[in-house]
């Protein structure tokens, strides 16, 4: 029998402790999105995208890990996005988040996202048409086609051009144009059954290209062929992206 001070035993225990930290951390990631997913009127699971047509003539595409509710107010029907990302082809509808309200013009197409791992606050991207935005604090402004803005309940950013491939996720793609690797990994992580971690040492590497979100592990392998990185996989569930 080995003694309690045996180096091999200590190494094994450290390994289990490290795995425990990873499991706890991973649980925290899923816990953050679990409650709104379970309680919302419309929700999507890991890797799922869902298309909806509402009675108001509104077509919606919900991205993975999205939670959306329908509310009836004195002003009419309102959608409330508590988590995730949605493509809106607008009829007569209003969409709100905790940070404000978005009112698309008729026949407009918008991507609206809220509380994403790589994005603080709410982001509105107008692909066509226009939209009016009213912040929770009361300020209002408008966006035209080709503009996007990110805001929280108190502040808003200056409108800038819509990101390349803003709606590519609808077709199962992530389009990156000099995107930080950390953000690419964060996006792929949402579509993968498991957890992907990106080492801060390589998180700032810039990535350009087209990647499948329906096959996130294949996309991780593709990244190793174009960047000086490697992927460490643990039990097929955990993946760590580190320097090669």
Where are these regions (language model features)?
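Short low-complexity stretches enriched in small and charged residues
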Residues: 12-21, 82-86, 153-154, 161-166, ...
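Short alpha-helical basic/polar micro-motif
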Residues: 10, 60, 186
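N-terminal export/assembly leaders
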Residues: 155-244
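Short, small/hydrophobic-biased targeting/export segments
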Residues: 40, 46-153
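Short charge-dense sequence patches
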Residues: 11-14, 33, 81, 132-144, ...
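Extreme N-terminal targeting/processing segments
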Residues: 1-35, 212, 218-244
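Short N-terminal micro-motifs specific to bacterial/archaeal maturation
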Residues: 3-4, 137, 175, 210
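Short secondary-structure junction motifs
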Residues: 37-39, 193
């Amino acid at each position: 029998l080995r003694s309690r001070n045996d180096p091999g035993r200590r190494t094994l225990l450290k390994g289990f402790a490290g795995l425990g930290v990873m499991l706890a951390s991973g649980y925290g990631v899923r816990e953050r999105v679990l409650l709104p997913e379970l309680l919302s009127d419309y929700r999507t699971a890991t890797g799922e995208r869902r298309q909806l047509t509402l009675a108001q003539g509104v077509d919606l595409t919900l991205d993975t890990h999205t939670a959306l509710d329908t509310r009836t107010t004195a002003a009419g029907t309102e959608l409330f996005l508590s988590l995730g990302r949605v493509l809106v082809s607008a009829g007569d509808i209003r969409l709100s988040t905790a940070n404000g309200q978005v009112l698309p013009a008729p026949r407009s197409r918008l991507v609206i996202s809220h509380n994403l791992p790589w994005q603080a606050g709410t982001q509105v991207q107008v692909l066509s048409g226009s939209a009016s935005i009213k912040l929770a604090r009361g300020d209002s402004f408008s966006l035209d086609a080709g503009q996007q803005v990110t805001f929280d309940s108190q502040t808003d950013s200056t409108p800038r051009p819509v990101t390349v491939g803003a709606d590519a996720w609808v077709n199962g793609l992530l389009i990156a144009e000099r995107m930080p690797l950390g953000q690419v990994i964060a996006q792929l992580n949402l579509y993968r059954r498991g957890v992907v971690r990106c080492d801060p040492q390589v998180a700032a590497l810039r990535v350009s290209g087209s990647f499948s979100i329906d096959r996130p592990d294949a996309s991780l392998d593709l990244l190793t062929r174009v960047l000086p990185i490697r992927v460490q996989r643990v039990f097929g569930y955990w993946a760590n992206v580190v320097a090669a």
